[in-house]
């Protein structure tokens, strides 16, 4: 297929087609098997993180260098002169984009990536997270990991557990998987952290099966993918948090009735929601998932910066 990702802004998952998602997943798999260290040789990529990040920033910068690109940028935008001097985001983007071939950006403000794409002078902007809005490259590595472990992206039973209300990774991955066939979702959360109504309405309109649960153990035997998330302590008082947290802790014992092919994923960092005894089960795949971020981001950068590979 033609590479429709060439020079495209990567702002949100709904703007990517199934075919584009499949192309990224396929390319990531190829690059994992056969490294291509000169794919973006002589290209310069800005890595601009206006809020602190560890995994996403290091993963992106590793990906850039592994396929031959050069990286410039910063990892804490609040400490840069452009922030201290009060420069607007649009002005910063116009200046930085004149130096580079692609612009990777994380920003605490929802909608910042889209704003950046309007002022980047045609330089493709890749959203590395904009507030609680979207985190599309996390979704790409999640999709690649699911395809790698299940050998398919159709015909899957997928559960999301924990903070489904505020978790941008959950929202984006749900929207991505909804583009595939015969997906069934299990949303496991306390009522206070249930999946947002707008996403459930999107699934209803598309005729996609889903069910709401407050108990994790009962759904595990039906699953191909169990996607755990962290319940954020700051959203509850102490007693309420303790109750909710204890209800959604995955242990090795809970996985005894799971399908052989079940993989446990987590966007990390984990706190208490997956016990360390799960790490040594054949179901644990969250550290490999994090590693796959490098391959998914290599694939995305290569496709955005090359008309053909």
Swiss-Prot record:
Keywords assigned: Pyrimidine biosynthesis, Transferase
Residues that, per the record, bind L-aspartate: 85, 168, 230
User: Could you tell me what reaction this enzyme catalyses?
Assistant: carbamoyl phosphate + L-aspartate = N-carbamoyl-L-aspartate + phosphate + H(+)
Q: Which domain of life is it from?
A: Bacteria
EC numbers, comma separated = 2.1.3.2
Binding of carbamoyl phosphate, residues: 55-56, 106, 135, 138, 268-269
Name its pathway.
Pyrimidine metabolism; UMP biosynthesis via de novo pathway; (S)-dihydroorotate from bicarbonate: step 2/3
Pfam families noted in UniProt: OTCace, OTCace_N
Q: Name one GO molecular function term.
A: aspartate carbamoyltransferase activity
Going by the record, the broad EC class of this enzyme is transferase
Gene Ontology biological process terms from the UniProt entry: 'de novo' pyrimidine nucleobase biosynthetic process; 'de novo' UMP biosynthetic process; amino acid metabolic process
GO CC annotation: what is one?
A: cytosol
Q: Which family is annotated?
A: Belongs to the aspartate/ornithine carbamoyltransferase superfamily. ATCase family.
What does the UniProt function comment say about this protein? Catalyzes the condensation of carbamoyl phosphate and aspartate to form carbamoyl aspartate and inorganic phosphate, the committed step in the de novo pyrimidine nucleotide biosynthesis pathway.
Subunit info? Heterododecamer (2C3:3R2) of six catalytic PyrB chains organized as two trimers (C3), and six regulatory PyrI chains organized as three dimers (R2).
Its name, as the record gives it, is: Aspartate carbamoyltransferase catalytic subunit
Gene for this chain: pyrB
